[in-house]
């Protein structure tokens, strides 16, 4: 049995591990790193948010010569979203800490980080998948991407991100040919982490959370992540069993803030494989 004085290096210290968990989380994010984070509600009472959300004003219309161009109303609607709490708990015995292979304490932290990262990412993806703008197109083709971009009806392109299955991303890269820009050539001014490259002004991010044939094209500001409370870490000691439990939680909600800034791409029956 190890002898000597117990030092801080042998213990689980929340103040040290909390920032470490945050670092583990940020490395794994794909969708959540794209969301705009709002922390203004931290410390405020209540668990249900009533928030404004922009409503898409409709596609452009054909106007005959000499006729007035109709004006559409840009509306906001009130929506509600209930704050969610996600949590993770692990427990480890003194025997495991003292005699376990590898680094059980470090693995606890890693597992907490991965668990939170996946849940937050999934919730942001769920919000994006609720996009009101949709298009049936083959996203493995450059003209399929162009069809999605056209849904924005922009005169001047704004920064946008294409979230796409890795297999589809490879096919799109091949079809884009000289219209594809490698990630190493994009510089530091990228609006999202994990860029694979760029085509037609869209930063391409690969993710296995989307099935082949399905993709999301979104502009910054499409989705928001409201934080009620960020990571909170607690340690509970059970002397009777000589175990130390680690608990972490986070309170937040992800929602589609601007419907006009997200397009869901699916490969419908009208899209032919070439």
Swiss-Prot record:
One of its GO terms (cellular component) is viral capsid. Keywords: Capsid protein, Late protein, Virion. It is found in: Virion. Pfam families: Phage_capsid_4. The keyword Cell inner membrane does not apply. The keyword Zinc does not apply. Its main location: virion. Assembles to form an icosahedral capsid. This is Major capsid protein. The lineage of its organism: Viruses, Duplodnaviria, Heunggongvirae, Uroviricota, Caudoviricetes.
């Amino acid at each position: 049995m190890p002898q000597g004085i117990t030092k801080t290096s042998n213990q689980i210290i929340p103040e040290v591990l909390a920032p470490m968990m945050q670092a583990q989380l940020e490395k794994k994010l794909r969708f959540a790193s794209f969301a705009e984070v709002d922390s203004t509600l931290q410390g405020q009472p209540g668990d249900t948010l009533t928030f404004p959300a922009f409503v898409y004003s409709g596609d452009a219309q054909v106007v005959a010569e000499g006729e007035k161009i109709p004006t559409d109303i840009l509306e906001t609607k009130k929506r509600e979203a209930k704050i969610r709490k996600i949590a993770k708990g692990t427990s480890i015995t003194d025997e495991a800490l003292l005699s376990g292979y590898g680094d059980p304490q470090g693995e606890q932290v890693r597992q907490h980080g991965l668990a939170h990262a996946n849940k937050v990412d999934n919730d942001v993806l769920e919000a994006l998948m609720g996009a009101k703008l949709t298009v049936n197109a083959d996203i493995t083709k450059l003209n399929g991407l162009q069809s999605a971009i056209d849904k924005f009806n922009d005169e001047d392109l704004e920064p946008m991100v294409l979230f796409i299955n890795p297999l589809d991303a490879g096919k799109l890269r091949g079809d884009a040919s000289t219209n594809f820009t490698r990630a190493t050539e994009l510089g530091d001014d990228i609006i999202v982490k994990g860029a694979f490259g760029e085509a037609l002004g869209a930063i391409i991010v690969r993710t296995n959370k989307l099935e082949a044939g399905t993709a999301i094209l979104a502009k910054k500001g499409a989705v928001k992540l409201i934080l009620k409370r960020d990571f909170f870490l607690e340690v509970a000691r059970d002397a009777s069993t000589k175990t130390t439990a680690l608990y972490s939680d986070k309170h937040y909600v992800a929602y589609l803030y601007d419907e006009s800034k997200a397009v869901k791409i699916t490969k419908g029956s009208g899209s032919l494989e070439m």
